[in-house]
């Protein structure tokens, strides 16, 4: 059963602390210039799954596609921002199953991660995280009780930030952050999308949607498998 709770008042939105747009292959030569690195992802299809990987510090991370929906990411040195994972393009309201080993040391997320267009929105359904809870730095919009836990619904705004539509765009980030952390389970994305809509957070046309591991100026390792 899904239950919703919404707030009638909230604090001002702030820029999300960890936001990475369309995720860069670390075994390629790093491009010149930070902006180019930030807007040049590696994407494709691997074993029937869409994948996306992005980093602004190629020397600090290794991303590997495995069999089926499996992928792994190792990052170190407490440097840079890295996001990688597998899923689908386009995204949709689907139930996503996942399992694996997620071991962050510092600021990191394990999340269903995606984008929409018209409006341009970056979204996270955070299943696990390291030392920083992203809902603590965003405007609280409500709660959803589903899949054995309460998720905090929040929104933040990015100004002149890299996105799937260019390197200097203003857009909102939608968040559902699970209170009872886990590294395996299933995510009913449609329930989260409906909860966001009832909280006034509208999505557009789906671009890609992946189970992602993100690390920001931290270290860690993860091997995950996604299916749907």
UniProtKB/Swiss-Prot annotation:
Describe the thermal dependence of activity: Optimum temperature is 40 degrees Celsius.
The record's keywords, sorted A to Z, are: Carbohydrate metabolism, Glycosidase, Hydrolase, Polysaccharide degradation, Secreted, Signal, Virulence, Xylan degradation
The signal sequence is 1-19
Compartments annotated for it: namely: Secreted
Q: Where is the GH11 domain?
A: 37-227
Provide the pH dependence: Optimum pH is 7.0.
Which SUPFAM superfamilies would you find in this protein's record? Concanavalin A-like lectins/glucanases
Describe which pathway this protein belongs to, using the record's wording: Glycan degradation; xylan degradation
- Phenotype caused by lack of the gene: Leads to about 40 percent reduction of xylanase activity when grown in culture with xylan as carbon source.
Q: Name one GO cellular component term.
A: extracellular region
Record text on activity regulation: Inhibited by the proteinaceous endoxylanase inhibitor I from T.aestivum (TAXI-I).
Instruction: Give the top-rank taxon of the lineage listed in the UniProt record for this protein.
Output: Eukaryota
The residues responsible for catalysis, as annotated, are 122, 214
Record EC number: 3.2.1.8
A Gene Ontology BP annotation from the UniProt entry = xylan catabolic process
**Predominant localisation class:** secreted
**Catalytic activity, reaction form:** Endohydrolysis of (1->4)-beta-D-xylosidic linkages in xylans
Q: What positions belong to coiled-coil segments?
A: none
Q: Name one GO molecular function term.
A: endo-1,4-beta-xylanase activity
Induction info reads: Expression is under the control of transcription factor XYR1 and highly induced during wheat infection and by xylan.
Similarity remark: Belongs to the glycosyl hydrolase 11 (cellulase G) family.
| Physiological role | Endo-1,4-beta-xylanase involved in the hydrolysis of xylan, a major structural heterogeneous polysaccharide found in plant biomass representing the second most abundant polysaccharide in the biosphere, after cellulose. Plays an important role in causing fusarium head blight (FHB) on cereal crops. Induces cell death and hydrogen peroxide accumulation in infected wheat leaves.
What is the official name of this protein in its record? Endo-1,4-beta-xylanase B
